[in-house]
Every structure is written in C-alpha cells, then in structure tokens.
C-alpha cells in the first residue's frame, strides 16, 4: 500500500479516517453489554476541574444583572439572525421549552437540567432546527458571567425572561442546573435509524416505554397530526399520551400549548430541500451551526425551520388572549404551507386578526393553527378546558405560569436544590416535599444504642438490608427523585410494590416503628429519630454485624437528618413510575422484557450513579447477605450466608463449576461440580454476567483474590453508604 496520505502517527488513510477509526468493539459485537454509561461525565471530560462547585459560584451571581442583559437582548436584533417582529422572545421560549421538554417520567431522563441541548443528538434533532442560533445569541451573556452561570440555567432563564419581557408574570425561577460536557450515553431515544421515523408503536397505538415523543427527533408530537395525518382528534390522543409521559395532566397540557403558542411564529416559506445539514453534519467552516438554507437569504422572512408557516396570534410578541381568541372565534380550513406542511387557516378572517409580517410591519398576513393546536378545541377533554381558560383569563395565566414552572423545573428534584432569589415559596406536590427537620438529631452515643436495639429486635440481617435497600434504591440521578428521605417506603404506592415483599416489609417496619416510638418517648430536650433514619440505620447495623461475622470490624457511616413524609405529601400516581421493573441487586424481574436482565441492571446502576466497580461489589455483597427477592437461592454462592464475605466472587470464578442453562431462554442456570456432577449453585443471567463479561470478570477477579476480603468489605461499605445518601442534598 502506498505511504502517501497515511497518518505518520496512527497509520490511518483517507479510507479509514480518524472520525470513525475503523470497526469498534460494538460494531463487531453489537449485543455487548454497554458499561460505558456507568462512567460518563468524569473529571477527565470536565474542563472546570474537580474542585469546581457550581452551587457556590451561582451564589455569587448577580441574577438581576443577568436578567437585565437578557431583557436587552430580546430586542437587540442581529443582522446575522434577525429577530422576528424585532423580538427574540418566541425563539428563546422555544429553546427553553425544547430544552426541558425532553423529560420523561418513566426513567426521569431528558429535561433541561444538564444543558444537553448543546450536544448530539439533541443539537441536531429536526425539532430543534435553528435553536443553534438561539444559543449563539446567548453566548455574549454566557461569556460575560462565565462559571457563575451554567448553560443549562441560562437556557431556562432566557425562556423566563422572554415571557416576562412580553408582559407575562412567571411563577419563579430556580437555578442550580449543572452543565455536562459530553453527550449522554444512557438515554434511549428510540430504535429508528432515520429522522422522524416512528417505529415505536405496537398494537393499536401503544407507545414504547420509556419514550414520550411520537417520532425520532421530535420533542412532543407531530404538529401536522399523527404520522402527518391532519386529524385533530387523533392528534389529541397523541398529545395526551405524550404529555402524560412528561408529567403533565390535561389542564397543564392545554395551558402550556395555549400559553406557549401565544408567542412567536413558525417558519416554512420555501422548499425544504434547500435546507442544509444539521449541526453535527455541517461543514467545519459553519462552526457548529446547521440548517443553512438556500432559500433566498435563509433568514428573516426567508427563514426555513419546521415547514409550517405563520404566527398563531395577531400580536405575537405580547401576552394576551390572542391564541384562545383565534382558536374559538373562527372555523378553520385545512391548507398547506409554502413548504408543503399541513396546517389550518381561519375562514373569513377579519382585518384586525391578521398578523404583521415578521420583518415588515407594514404588511399583514394570515395567522395559522397546526393540527395539534386544533386538538385543543376539538378533543372532548381538552376543548372544555381551553374554553374555560378563554372565559377566565386570570385562571389561564395562573395555569400557564405554574405549568411552565413545572415544565422547566420537573427534572431538578426537590425544592431544596433550587438556588436564587426567585425560588417560589409555595411547596408543590410534584416536588416530592419532605418535612424540614424540627427536632434535635441523635449523636454517636444514641446511634450506637439504636443499633443495639435493632440487632436485638429479632429482625434478620436480610430483612434489615432489604428494607434499607428498598427505601434508598428508588433514587434516580436523572430527575433526582426517590431515595430514603421521607420514608415513603411505608406509604402508598411503595408499600404495595411486589419487589418490596409487602408482608415482610410491614413486619420489619412495624418492628422499627416500635423501636422508634420507644426511643423517642424516652428522650428529653426534643431529641428524636425519624423512621427514615431508622430504616437506613438498620441497614448499616446489619452490614456491620455481617462484617463482624466475617472477622472484619467496620463502622458504616451514618448521618441522621432524614424526615418522614406524609401520604398527603405523596402523589401516588407520580410515584408509581419509580417502581422497579427489575432490580438485579435483589435478583428481581417483574416479568420478561425485550431487554436482558443484565442490561436492566446496568440501567438501574446508572440511575444510582454507580460505577462498574461499585455495582460489582454491591451485588456480590448483597448476594451472600441474602437480600434476594423472596429468598431466592440464585447467586447465593456461599456456605456462610448472612456473612459479608467475598464468597460470591470466589465461587463464581471457580473453574470446578460447570454452568448449564435450565431452559432454552437462558434465563436461569445450574452450576454442577465438573467431576462429580453434583449441583453446587443456581444462578440468573445477572449473576453469571460477572463471570461472562470480560470487563466485569476483571473486576470480579479483584474481589475474588485470596487477599481481597479486607478490600471487599471496605469497598462494599463505601458503595452501600453512597446509595443510602444519594438523596441527601443537604449534605452535598
């Protein structure tokens, strides 16, 4: 082969460019377990450094000054991307909405909490066309405030300021969103291989979980109607399903659609074939901008974005009742935009209900509605809500303010994480509130006393560990929900979940409540312990006792300060999505799924912020301690149960055992002595993956070594403590 054109360092040629690097391991073995999602967003990719604390930097931010600059930007039209109607408000509302609107309740992923709109795939989704310009318009403000203001916060704040600058009173703003510096690898956006593909439905129109959007590359629904079919009633069904999966009820949905579409316009004046590639596919000289249009100037009145064309209201840069007024005042006729997209025009529209041309106020042009907009009138449930809002403007304004706040803050977790002077005082149930600490906390002496009482109560090590794990492991790093604080494991719906073994759970909680009540009754000076703390403390005591039985004297860290939420503070429907479909740490699977149990283990571990090493040591420890669902023997590779040993790894790696599947599905297995044929162990896929997967086996070998017992216990305690405190935002 000729040496010409070959890289002197890598040896790659033009047919093997550095951008692809040839076949990857995942290309060769596409079913290989994806462990990289456990090691995202490390200090190696973060230019801010390990010591950077955004919370502390945000406290130094002059929020009023930032907002003043944002208000000024709204009407500071730039020649390279001029503002519609001389005001960027509509563009920034769309940017903020699309930043937050990727959130879905099923796994808590998506949303505006990380600034992920800056990276692929979101920066190049068809539904985010030309939002790259919105972020470039914000760059001078981001540049000015630097480390004190994250992109994630700035994008949401810009949406708020856009609304406020056009006369709307928002509900508030909480900062604290921390930027990421690389694309998120843990989010499943769908299996389609083409933009706007919709291979995500089964049955009559059952949307695949955990997805919320109807097509690949859309935030919500297709505005032209389901799969481009302009049927407003059918669109209403899609909207209801999609918005419900984004935590919105019907009233919130109508408020968001009607409120958001009060502002701005759509762009579709020319041939969509003239639109250039998205940012990730654009040429290097475009400097990260995409969708360069060859239609006229490609900007201003010649802008191409969605293919729809026109404003919704006669006055697109002021808060008013224009959207609902137009929706109910006119009958609507199906038509097509100049770009060929289905939309609707008002019949016999009055002169005063025409909108100004976006870049020539001397011209008046018709408004429009999308098929999705007409669902707000024609859907049998949305219609009455929309009419009520139309007849009660103050109710509409309040509903939109609250729904917008929920949209832009739903993925931030509890209210205690919000930063800044504009955090609303009102506590909202979707924030999963927990009471403030109103008593003196227990100290080291009382902690030791309570541990002794718990261990003397007759509760077993597996019972204590299972209860503590069930309480804490509901946490999701995605939207910061769940966790042990609040002791919601004693409330509906968690107390009824199959994985929590309700009968055993009630017995354990009853015993712990007896201990708590007796202890609290004996105290003076207001010192108390919450059940939430006692549940975690019981798990810590069990770990210490199990380690002692193995000959290791350890103290598991414990910091009191959790409180007990009430059933009234707990939205049962909202918490239902936290129920584990599978929990590999308890060897539990609710039913058979299209993904493997080991893949679901990785997914849960990622939500618990566990590394592959932490996941491995935790699972191996929990197996020998007997935490399995319904005391299943699978993976119990020890003759010393309830003792914190490294036996799981020692016996898993023993070549004297030969494994065979017990069914053609390869879901459960039997391990027999190679020489005698005697059954030694049974296992699930989740157990055997730690010997099968090369990366996990390498970690298992560390803990299965002869000198590993001490390190195993130390690492198990550290990982256990991490999970128990994932929701302790008061400590971070």
From Swiss-Prot:
Positions contributing to heme b binding: 261
Keyword tags: Heme, Hydrogen peroxide, Iron, Metal-binding, Oxidoreductase, Peroxidase
Record text on cofactor binding: Binds 1 heme b (iron(II)-protoporphyrin IX) group per dimer.
GO cellular component, one term: cytosol
Site, Transition state stabilizer: residue positions: 94
UniProt cross-link Tryptophyl-tyrosyl-methioninium (Tyr-Met) (with W-97), position: 220-246
Any single biological process term in GO: cellular response to hydrogen peroxide
Active site positions, chain numbering: 98 (proton acceptor)
Cross-link (Tryptophyl-tyrosyl-methioninium (Trp-Tyr) (with M-246)): 97-220
Alphabetized InterPro entries for the sequence: Catalase_peroxidase, Haem_peroxidase, Haem_peroxidase_sf, Peroxidases_AS, Peroxidases_heam-ligand_BS
Highest taxon of source: Bacteria
Catalytic activity: H2O2 + AH2 = A + 2 H2O; 2 H2O2 = O2 + 2 H2O
Modification(s) after translation: Formation of the three residue Trp-Tyr-Met cross-link is important for the catalase, but not the peroxidase activity of the enzyme.
One MF term in the entry's GO annotations: heme binding
UniProt feature coiled coil, ranges: none
UniProt-listed Enzyme Commission number(s): 1.11.1.21
Protein family according to the UniProt entry: Belongs to the peroxidase family. Peroxidase/catalase subfamily.
Subunit structure of this chain's protein: Homodimer or homotetramer.
Known function: Bifunctional enzyme with both catalase and broad-spectrum peroxidase activity.
Matches recorded under HAMAP family: Catal_peroxid
Protein's recorded name: Catalase-peroxidase
Taxonomy of the source species: Bacteria, Pseudomonadati, Chlorobiota, Chlorobiia, Chlorobiales
Gene label: katG
């Amino acid at each position: 082969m000729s040496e010409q054109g070959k890289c002197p360092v890598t040896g790659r040629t033009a047919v093997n460019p550095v951008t692809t690097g040839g076949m990857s391991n995942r290309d060769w073995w596409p079913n290989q377990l994806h462990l990289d999602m456990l090691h995202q967003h490390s200090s190696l990719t973060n230019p801010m450094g390990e010591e950077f604390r955004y919370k502390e930097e945000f406290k130094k931010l002059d929020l009023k000054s930032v907002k003043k600059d944002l208000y000024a930007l709204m009407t500071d039209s730039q020649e390279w991307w001029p503002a519609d109607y001389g005001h960027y408000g509509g563009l920034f509302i769309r940017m903020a909405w699309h930043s937050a609107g990727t959130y879905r309740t099923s796994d808590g992923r998506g949303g505006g909490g990380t600034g992920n709109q800056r990276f692929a795939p979101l920066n190049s989704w068809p539904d985010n066309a030309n939002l790259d310009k919105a972020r470039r318009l914000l760059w001078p403000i981001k540049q000015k405030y630097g480390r004190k203001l994250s992109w994630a916060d700035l994008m949401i704040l810009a949406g708020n300021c856009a609304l406020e600058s056009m006369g709307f009173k928002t509900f508030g703003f909480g900062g604290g969103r921390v930027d990421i510096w690389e694309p998120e690898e843990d989010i499943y956006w769908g299996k389609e291989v083409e933009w706007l593909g919709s291979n995500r439905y089964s049955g009559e129109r059952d949307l695949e979980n955990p997805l919320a959007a109807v097509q690949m590359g859309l935030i919500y629904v297709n505005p032209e109607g389901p799969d481009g079919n302009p049927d407003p009633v059918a669109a209403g069904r899609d909207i209801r399903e999609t918005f419900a999966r984004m935590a919105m009820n019907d009233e919130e949905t109508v408020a968001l659609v009607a409120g958001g579409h009060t502002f701005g316009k759509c762009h579709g004046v020319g041939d969509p074939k003239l639109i250039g590639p998205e940012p990730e596919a654009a040429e290097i000289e475009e400097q990260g901008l995409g969708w360069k249009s060859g239609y006229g100037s490609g900007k201003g009145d010649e802008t191409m974005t969605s293919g729809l064309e026109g404003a919704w209201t006669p006055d697109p840069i002021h808060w008013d009742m224009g959207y609902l007024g137009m929706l109910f005042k006119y009958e609507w006729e199906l038509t097509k935009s100049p770009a060929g997209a289905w939309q609707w025009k008002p019949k016999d529209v009055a002169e005063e209900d025409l909108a100004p041309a976006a870049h020539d106020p001397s011209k008046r042009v018709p408004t429009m509605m999308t098929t999705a907009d007409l669902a707000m009138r024609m859907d049998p449930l949305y219609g009455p809500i929309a009419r009520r809002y139309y007849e009660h403007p103050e109710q509409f304004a309040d509903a939109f303010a609250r729904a917008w706040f929920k949209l832009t803050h739903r993925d931030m977790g509890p209210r205690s994480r919000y930063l800044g002077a504009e955090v609303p005082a009102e506590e909202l149930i979707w924030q999963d509130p927990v009471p403030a600490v109103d008593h003196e906390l227990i100290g080291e002496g009382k902690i030791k006393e309570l541990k002794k009482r718990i261990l003397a109560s007759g509760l077993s090590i597996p019972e204590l560990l299972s209860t503590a794990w069930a309480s804490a492991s509901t946490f999701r790093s995605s939207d910061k929900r769940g966790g042990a604080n609040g002791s919601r494991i004693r409330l509906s719906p968690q107390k009824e979940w199959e994985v929590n073994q309700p009968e055993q759970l009630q017995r354990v909680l009853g015993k712990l409540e007896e201990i708590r009540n007796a202890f609290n009754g004996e105290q003076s000076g207001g010192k108390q312990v919450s059940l939430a703390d006692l549940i975690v403390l019981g798990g810590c005591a069990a770990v210490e006792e199990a380690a002692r039985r193995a000959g290791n004297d350890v103290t598991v860290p414990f910091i009191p300060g959790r409180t007990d939420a009430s059933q009234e503070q707990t939205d049962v429907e909202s918490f239902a999505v936290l129920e584990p479909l599978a929990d590999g740490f308890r060897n539990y699977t609710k039913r058979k799924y299209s993904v493997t149990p080991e893949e679901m283990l990785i997914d849960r571990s990622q939500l618990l912020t566990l590394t592959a090493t932490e996941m491995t040591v935790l699972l191996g420890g929990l197996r020998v301690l007997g935490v399995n669902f319904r005391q299943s023997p699978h993976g119990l590779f020890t003759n010393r149960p309830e003792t914190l040993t490294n036996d799981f790894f020692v016996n898993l790696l023993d070549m004297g055992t030969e494994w065979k599947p017990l069914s053609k599905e390869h879901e459960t297995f039997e391990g027999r002595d190679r020489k005698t044929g005697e059954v030694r162990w049974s296992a699930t896929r989740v157990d055997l993956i730690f010997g099968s997967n090369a990366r996990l086996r390498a970690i298992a070998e560390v803990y299965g070594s002869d000198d590993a017992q001490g390190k195993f216990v130390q690492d198990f305690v550290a990982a256990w403590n991490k999970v128990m405190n994932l929701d302790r935002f008061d400590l971070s």
